[in-house]
Amino acid sequence: MRHAVSVRAPSRCYAAPHFSQRAQRSTMQDGTLLAAVDLGSNSFRLEIGRFEHGHIQRVEYLKETVRQGGGLDEERNLSLDAMQRGWDCLARFAERLAGFERTHVRAVATQTLREAHNRDVFIERGNAILGYPIDVVSGPEEARLIYQGVSRLLPQSDERRLVVDIGGRSTELILGQRYQAQAVTSLRMGSVAWSTRYFADGNFTAAAFEAAETAAKAMLDETLQVFRPDAWDVAYGSSGTIGAVGEILAMAGHPPGAITREALDWLLAKLLRAGHASRVRLDGLKEDRRPVIGGGLSVLRAVFSLLGIERMQVAQGALRQGALYDLLSREWPETDLRTSTVAGLMQRFAVDTPHAQRVARVAGTLFGQVATKNSERAARKLDWAARLHEIGCRIAHSGYHRHGAYILDNTDAAGFAQPELHHLGLLVRAHRGKLRKLELDWSDAQFTLQLACLRLAVALCHARRDPDMDGIRLERKGARFVLRSRTGWAALYPQSAHLLREESQDWLRTPWELMLELG
């Protein structure tokens, strides 16, 4: 089993880190509106909820079939038509989200945009259209969010749960109890991908279903050591294919809210009898699901067969509910999963914890002297970067800042989206060395401020003991930073003063300036 934070291997199983769900001391007021946007491979969804007494009540739900997953070519580039469908949908969502606070909206992109080589083109314009950042999450992080969404809408019990989510291009499996995901995996197969591969012409034949199920079983085979039948008590299915199948079965008179092997056999027989997707006549089958029902059913049948499932309950929660509750957890550092993930990374890569905490304290002190209002989240990210700035030493001390950036850019870290990890990686990469050699966005004042505070903290903590910060003040005047000390400080700490003067010279090669007034 893989650890929760591991070099990226989206198709592998790994154990999610322990994160106790303590009572959330949130600054959020009752009545606050929150929103989650799920950019799936088949559909884009918008969920709006109202925060009331620690829970989120649904206010509005919008869904549009975009089928972006079908727009990937053989080189894994999204077609312009597929991107345009996505942008048009985001424009409609943006109108509904007008006026929402930035920290109250979470937009999450999944497998199609994980795969797309030209995803940056879509994301850059999508960010501008939506008005909120789109986070491309890893497969394991998608699985964690799915479990959060499912578990939040289930009665609390000590039952061991298996949660399955079959999306357009990926399938997530999760083992967990209560709110804690204990093992997750994400497999690159789904309703859109399997329909394109095995039912491209829309024909339903026994041979096509056999080939599709065999391929799905081969993908699932590597998960059996973790997701074995004795590892869970109750199986739940969420969203997408499972929700659609559950609705079809209920309309046909099968027990509502449940899927059995016998019911799947019945549905397969119906599709084979129809012979083609266009001829399927089933109550509950929506038109947007018709082109992908064959691929979705073949994956679901393989899951039942290989994991030994006899009965699966259809869950109400899904990724978007998980994203909403994740917004709540981020309101307070103590409940932010990313904080415990950083601690796990520090332990795994044998970071010198006292020194990392020292640098984080000094960087935080400097940042607090110059940061504007509502900079708490930026301060938290600076704290994480400072705690991880020596993570690359586990590989080699020479060039450790580059090694650290590589680790963060290629890690599945619970709670983090890939852009967030890249942001931390940039800070770690740039915390030492010549600034002129780096390709950084100097127009991003928040990032530049974080970087300046981190580099100054590293210099002040060079002796790996607590520096004398009495009288040390950092100010910002436009594109100029001014660092002051009390009279006599430079004479007491000549090496620190020397390092700060070198740092000041390095900033001359950037659009920013670091001035020193050392007494």
Task: Describe the residue ranges of each PLM region.
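Helical "lid/coupling" subdomains associated with nucleotide-phosphate turnover
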Residues: Q29-L34, I48-F51, R67, G71-R102, ...
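Short N-terminal binding/cap micro-motifs at the start of the first secondary-structure element
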Residues: S43-R45
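Beta-strand initiation motifs
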Residues: G54-V59, Q180-Q182
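A generic, well-ordered mixed alpha/beta core segment in the N-terminal half of proteins
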Residues: R160-I174
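A short amphipathic beta-strand at an alpha->beta junction
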Residues: E310, T510-G519
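Short, non-transmembrane amphipathic alpha-helical segments
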Residues: L492-L514
